[in-house]
């Protein structure tokens, strides 16, 4: 909404792009913005893990690179990509398992799985994004999570970060911004079995986090928010402001 207003007031996309290009790019990568590429069914997330520079990004599932306009949030100019073929079987197995999980738990969710060599280590990085924007109902919300592990030895450390951001602004302004860091051990065996355990750990961690958030909100509603509510006056009745002039205080105010 704010961006659209600024764009309308400025009425110059070139100037807006020049002045805020870096901010838009960083925002889209931080927020795991979904992108739809013409000719391909599945969306891909815009993340730092797929950033190739010069506004080009990697779509590892479709094995292409593409150009992304951060201002218009439009993808274009897809080209085939054959990088990191050594990790293809691992990436594909984790992607297949994660897609099934996201489809079941996040109706509007998108996931992207990368197979990368980081500091000489073969690494799987998985990103999940799901959002619901309801500006007409005065609320918006987004879920993001990122998980990574290295393929080395019989066990590895699975590291994750979970993020929730919700904004409700009807007759008030309430925001929830929360994140949680997770570390779990994962057994490295065959691709399919590792992918299965990978998703099992993700499902448990994300479920526990969402349950904890819900329980915390219930506790706050029963305690913190209740304490903030305006108490009734000593008469134990609300003032009818439409009849204020019929009250003694209203007449005194009128005669003042």
Swiss-Prot record:
It holds the Pfam family F-actin_cap_A. GO terms for biological process: actin cytoskeleton organization; barbed-end actin filament capping; cell junction assembly. It is found in: Cytoplasm, Cytoskeleton. One of its GO terms (molecular function) is actin filament binding. One of its GO terms (cellular component) is F-actin capping protein complex. The keyword Cytoplasm applies. SUPFAM superfamilies: Subunits of heterodimeric actin filament capping protein Capz. The keyword Cell division does not apply. Keywords: Actin-binding, Cytoplasm, Cytoskeleton. It comes from the Eukaryota. Disulfide bonds: none annotated. PANTHER family: F-ACTIN-CAPPING PROTEIN SUBUNIT ALPHA (PTHR10653), F-ACTIN-CAPPING PROTEIN SUBUNIT ALPHA-1 (PTHR10653:SF5). Component of the F-actin capping complex, composed of a heterodimer of an alpha and a beta subunit. Subunit of dynactin, a multiprotein complex part of a tripartite complex with dynein and a adapter, such as BICDL1, BICD2 or HOOK3. The dynactin complex is built around ACTR1A/ACTB filament and consists of an actin-related filament composed of a shoulder domain, a pointed end and a barbed end. Its length is defined by its flexible shoulder domain. The soulder is composed of 2 DCTN1 subunits, 4 DCTN2 and 2 DCTN3. F-actin-capping proteins bind in a Ca(2+)-independent manner to the fast growing ends of actin filaments (barbed end) thereby blocking the exchange of subunits at these ends. Unlike other capping proteins (such as gelsolin and severin), these proteins do not sever actin filaments. May play a role in the formation of epithelial cell junctions. Forms, with CAPZB, the barbed end of the fast growing ends of actin filaments in the dynactin complex and stabilizes dynactin structure. Belongs to the F-actin-capping protein alpha subunit family. This is F-actin-capping protein subunit alpha-1. It comes from Xenopus laevis. The gene is capza1.
